[in-house]
C-alpha cells in the first residue's frame, strides 16, 4: 500500500515541486500567518500560486512519504528486514510512525483548508478558479497569469 501511495504522489510531486519552493513572498506571508488563522484575511500580504501554508503541507506530505518509503524497507518482511540489525529496524519503525503521524496531520490540515476556504474545492477538483477568487487569494499568481506577453 505504501509503495502505491508514493508512486501515486510522485507524478504530482514532479509536476508541482517548483511551484512549492518557498520564496520571499512566502516568508512575508509566514510572518502574518496568525492573522490568517484568526480570519483576518484582508491583512495578508499577496502570494503566488500557493501560499506558505499550502507549501508547508506539500513539503510535509512529500518528505513524510519519502521517509515512510525508506524506513519501510528496513522492516519489510521477508524481503529486506533480514539485511538490517534489529536496532536499525527499531529506529526505522520509530521514523515510520513519526512520519505517518506527520502525513496524517498534513492530510487533516489539507482537508480542513479545503472546507475552510471557499472556492478551494473547485480549484482542486476542476483545476480552475474564478478570476475574483484568484485575485483575492493569490494576487501575485493572478497578476502573472493576466499580464500580457
What are these regions (language model features)?
Residues 1-149:
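Membrane-embedded alpha-helical bundles that constitute the cytochrome b-like, heme-associated redox core
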Amino acid at each position: 500500500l505504501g509503495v502505491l501511495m508514493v508512486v501515486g504522489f510522485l507524478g504530482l510531486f514532479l509536476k508541482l515541486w517548483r511551484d512549492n519552493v518557498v520564496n520571499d513572498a512566502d516568508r512575508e506571508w509566514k510572518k502574518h500567518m496568525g492573522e490568517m488563522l484568526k480570519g483576518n484575511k484582508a491583512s495578508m500580504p499577496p502570494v503566488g500560486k500557493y501560499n506558505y501554508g499550502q507549501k508547508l503541507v506539500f513539503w510535509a506530505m512529500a518528505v513524510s512519504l519519502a521517509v515512510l518509503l525508506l524506513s519501510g524497507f528496513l522492516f519489510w518482511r521477508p524481503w529486506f528486514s533480514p539485511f538490517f540489525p534489529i536496532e536499525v529496524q527499531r529506529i526505522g519503525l520509530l521514523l515510520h510512525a513519526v512520519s505517518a503521524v506527520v502525513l496524517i496531520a498534513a492530510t487533516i490540515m489539507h482537508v480542513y483548508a479545503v472546507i475552510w476556504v471557499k472556492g478551494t474545492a473547485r480549484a482542486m477538483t476542476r483545476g480552475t478558479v474564478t478570476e475574483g477568487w484568484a485575485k483575492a487569494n493569490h494576487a501575485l499568481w493572478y497578476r502573472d497569469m493576466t499580464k500580457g506577453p
